[in-house]
């Protein structure tokens, strides 16, 4: 049995993305108090707010520091966050590394790393005072082994998050805070729908387990586990969810 602590206050970024919405739906069913941040669309999570009293959706551009800070102040003035899940979704563009300009790297770093850092600075003091907390970021299996071509801005931003996760796990462990990441291989989401069919078929054929892409629920199930008491002695881990396509 998955041992869930009593109702937790959980903050989720990218909550309307393919993975984020799957996480949100699963944790809503666990009756957790959810604060779901989204930027553009809320079509996948609107029904959650209408179905569950414990779900609140909030429009916020997390790469905009001022907007993010205002949202966080409002949330933490009345709620102590127990779990922070970082799952920002951003359309992936393929580009030769030398054709990228620094602004594109900066854009990815702002979305993935800067927002993660800024949110952590808000929620970690609360977690420290409770001597308990969970921080989970969604990365990519591309941070392990050889990266693919043409995705340098995305891969570099995810590597930066991996480094931040390890540093935070190391420094916050004494306060009872677990910091981990999950690295899925290619996931069947709106973000990957635009990829050429042939590319996806080649990729699937190389996955040992069931020759299929990862599903959002495959990732959400691991998030649910990390949120539970069963994972209270796991920190500093990057958990691969890749059907065996990446091993280390």
Enumerate the language-model features and the residues they cover.
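Conserved mid-core segment of classical short-chain dehydrogenase/reductases
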Residues: 89-106, 149-153, 193-197
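Catalytic loop of short-chain dehydrogenase/reductase
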Residues: 90, 134-160, 165-174, 186
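Conserved glycine-rich cofactor-binding loop
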Residues: 16-17
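Catalytic Tyr-X3-Lys loop
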Residues: 98-117, 132, 136, 161
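Short C-terminal tail/terminal secondary-structure segment
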Residues: 224, 235-248
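A conserved structural motif in NAD(P)-dependent oxidoreductases
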Residues: 208-219, 230
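Alpha-helical segment proximal to the catalytic Tyr-Lys
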Residues: 125, 170-171, 232
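Short, small/polar-rich loop/turn modules that mediate ligand/substrate recognition or access, typified
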Residues: 173, 178, 234-236
């Amino acid at each position: 049995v998955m041992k869930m602590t009593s109702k937790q206050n959980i903050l989720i970024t990218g909550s309307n993305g393919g993975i984020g919405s799957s996480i949100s739906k699963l944790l809503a069913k666990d009756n957790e108090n959810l604060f779901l941040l989204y930027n553009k669309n809320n079509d996948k999570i609107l029904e959650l707010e209408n179905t569950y009293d414990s779900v609140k959706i909030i429009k916020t551009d997390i790469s905009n520091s001022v907007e993010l800070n205002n949202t966080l102040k409002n949330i933490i003035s009345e709620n102590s966050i127990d779990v922070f899940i970082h799952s920002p979704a951003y359309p992936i563009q393929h580009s030769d590394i030398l054709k990228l300009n620094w602004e594109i790297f900066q854009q990815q770093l702002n979305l993935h790393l800067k927002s993660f850092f800024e949110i952590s600075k808000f929620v970690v003091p609360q977690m420290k005072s409770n001597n308990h907390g969970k921080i989970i970021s969604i990365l990519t299996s591309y941070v392990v082994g050889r990266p693919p071509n043409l995705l340098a801005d995305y891969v570099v931003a995810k590597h930066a998050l991996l480094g931040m996760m390890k540093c935070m796990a190391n420094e916050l462990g004494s306060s009872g805070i677990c910091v981990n990441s999950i690295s899925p291989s290619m996931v069947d989401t709106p973000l990957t729908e635009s990829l050429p069919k042939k590319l996806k078929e080649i990729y699937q054929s190389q996955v040992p387990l069931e020759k299929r892409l990862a599903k959002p629920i495959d990732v959400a199930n691991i998030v649910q586990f990390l949120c539970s008491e069963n994972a209270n002695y796991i920190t500093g881990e990057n958990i691969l969810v890749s059907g065996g396509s990446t091993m280390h």
